[in-house]
Curated annotation (Swiss-Prot):
Membrane topology, record value: Lipid-anchor
Protein name: Uncharacterized lipoprotein PM1897
Lipid-modified residues, S-diacylglycerol cysteine kind: C18
Domain of life: Bacteria
Signal peptide residue numbers: 1-17
Location of this chain's protein in the cell: Cell membrane
Keywords, alphabetical: Cell membrane, Lipoprotein, Membrane, Palmitate, Signal
Principal location class: membrane
Lipid attachment in record (N-palmitoyl cysteine): C18
Recorded GO CC terms: plasma membrane
């Protein structure tokens, strides 16, 4: 391989690693591990995917402390639970999360 090819591959590799991050991109979350909410805030994943009360309480916490990340947090939780259960998240859980979120906004 000549120096031009090496230079081209190096530049392409650098550009690929600098791909922009979408504000609503879903981050991969693992059970019991922390995950980023913002650049300097993390949460620990203790999600109980089939527990309606857990969905409500998570929404409440997001509404109270992370309101500007509403869509991101709900998307992360939904993606995690769909991956864990292999099924779509029932609407009742999203409804509970949104109810909790609205209550959290009031606090």
């Amino acid at each position: 391989m000549n120096w031009k090819a090496v230079l081209i591959f190096s530049v392409l590799g650098s550009l690929a690693s600098c791909a922009s991050y979408s504000e609503h991109a879903v981050q991969r979350i693992e059970a019991g591990k922390s995950f980023a909410v913002t650049g300097n805030t993390k949460r620990i994943n203790t999600m109980a995917c089939q527990d309606n009360d857990d969905w409500y309480l998570d929404g409440y916490r997001v509404g109270k402390s992370f309101r500007e990340h509403q869509q991101k947090m709900l998307s992360q939780r939904t993606a995690y639970c769909e991956e864990q259960t292999g099924k779509a998240v029932p609407d009742k859980f999203r409804h509970s999360w949104n109810s909790g979120y609205q209550q959290g906004l009031k606090r």
